[in-house]
């Protein structure tokens, strides 16, 4: 893929938590977010999975030894970037379905 953003962010946990506990929070927070996909355990996001889409794939791993969480995300910066976000926001403002015009975007390059 000749485009895309793959991000890895690190955070220190204030207390020890399990993958399942944190996953419940992710699922609860993103359950109504049409374009956010929380991946299965041990599946890192890849830009090829979001190419040409408005989706953002996220996942995380916890290092219990250091009490750190590593959060990963992937998005197509040409669709989910400013243009796709503008269409998504316009849809919400105008009372249209959030995904209107964003499910079958053109693929170039």
Q: Where do the PLM segments sit?
A:
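NAD(P)-dependent Rossmann-like dehydrogenase/reductase catalytic/cofactor-binding core
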Residues: 57, 62-109
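C-terminal substrate-binding/catalytic lobe of Rossmann-fold NAD(P)-dependent oxidoreductases
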Residues: 1-71
């Amino acid at each position: 893929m000749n485009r895309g953003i793959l991000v890895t962010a690190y955070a220190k946990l204030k207390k020890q938590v399990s993958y399942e506990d944190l996953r419940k929070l992710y699922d609860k927070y993103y359950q109504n977010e049409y374009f956010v996909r929380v991946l299965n355990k041990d599946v890192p996001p890849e830009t090829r999975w979001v190419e040409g889409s408005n989706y953002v794939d996220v996942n995380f791993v916890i290092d219990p030894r250091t009490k750190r969480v590593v959060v990963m995300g992937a998005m197509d910066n040409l669709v989910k970037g400013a243009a796709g976000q503008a269409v998504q926001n316009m849809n919400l403002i105008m009372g249209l379905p959030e995904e209107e015009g964003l499910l079958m975007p053109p693929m170039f390059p």
